[in-house]
């Protein structure tokens, strides 16, 4: 519960909840994400994460699946702190590492989190070396690589993510030609068209 969080983490959680668009709230029943059935995480582990300034909370009511947001920790969250997430590998489904200090070495450890469906890595220093590890996250549906050093070299690995339906490549080193080559790997043409439009901006 949010009331169990420390003051700073509570503020972050309330900010997230307060800024959910009303339209999304009204459609929440229709748009309930499909979540895996997993055992509950240890309250002690969740407390340790909160004390480290990492927001960790259930994705929805009546589920043990967890959303972790480390972006509030910013540059204070590095590769070593990814190890703090290991005790919740069975529950971690959504992970936000945007604007943190994680590197390719840290991304290598994410292969332990096979249930991940959403992963934010925008504005981190990761490079093409990370893509081979990302390709092993077979349940990924959403991947944000905005503002990273990812290039066309990563595309063969990203193409292996068969469940991926949203991929953000703004301000990366991926070329328009590289983005174009992704077309046949994405069934949803609207997502593909959005990707190409983003690359042209």
Residue ranges, per PLM feature:
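N-terminal capping/linker segments that flank leucine-rich repeat
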Residues: 1-117, 123, 129-133, 153, ...
